[in-house]
Amino acid sequence: TPKKSGSLVLNCLNCGALYEYQYETDCHKKGQRMSELSRLKPDPIPTIHPIPEYAADAALTAIYERTKSGFGVPWMGVVAMAFAHYREFYNCLWQAMEPVVVTQAFADACQKLRFAAEKEAASLSPVAICSKLTKLGYDDREIEEIKNCNEVFSSGNMPYVLMATLARLLLEEHSWDGKGSAQTHDAPSITFKRPVLIELHHADPNTTALFTDIRQTLGLPFVNTDYRAFARWPSYFNPAWTDLRSIILREEYEHAVLRVHEAAVLLAGSLPNMSKITPQQLIGCATQDGQLSEVLSVVRLFQWLLPGLAVNVAVFRRQLV
């Protein structure tokens, strides 16, 4: 099978450095390269059945703790909890990922993916809102708390994006032949506490209406953890969402998200396959959980929405500069 190679240049907003990511992927057996994995929203949107941490049995709780520790995050993303409904599938996927998340290649991929999201967010020119927050009475300490909450997701979403992307690649029968370095490093420390979340039954009518608008604007039947965390500060989140909503409705927004999707596909495909998992192995485990088409539809849903979520959180971050 012929090889394809190229490079993706990502601009680091925070440090001004320029990163060049060299990738190499095999052609798919049907002629589709990993780098050409389309951005695909399933239709109809599948019903998800996330297993929250409090409802997990002992075995699943252990996997959840290893997931959070491996990713260096203080919360289980909805994506992982939805995948965990398909127990054999998630066990197989995590067993393949666990030795990868401690590699330098994985840490670098997360960093580069974040830089890609932040570059796209900057190109969308979000409105700065710190002066508005100050006029509302927010002091520097409170604004810093919002920034810290954002940092949880700005950094923590990236492992979940890569996990969903790898899951889709394998379920769609792409070989995982990444050439990234298998050199290991210490697992990332969890530096932030799990954010306080505003659940639907906590929300007053205004916040309930905001959550409804988020679902309708994004075309999703649920509200991601990130938005429920930011809703802790309603007078901040209302103007932040209003600006983001106007950005989402612009044509260039989808182009920006597509570029982050493409970066995720390239970066995920470059990771070293430490366990040598094959598409057939993950497909076999997913089949044990029921209909393969159902599992694939759920995986496609999250692999579609997470690049957009990464851009949205980066927009929120840019608003606070």
Please name every model-derived segment.
Residues 5-7:
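Serine residues within intrinsically disordered or low-complexity segments
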Residues 31-321:
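Hydrophobic alpha-helical segments
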Residues 19:
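Cys/His-rich microdomains that often coordinate metals
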Residues 10-12, 316:
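Short beta-strand element of the conserved SAM-dependent methyltransferase core
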Residues 12-15, 27:
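Cysteine-centered motifs
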Residues 1-3, 34:
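Accessible peptide chain termini
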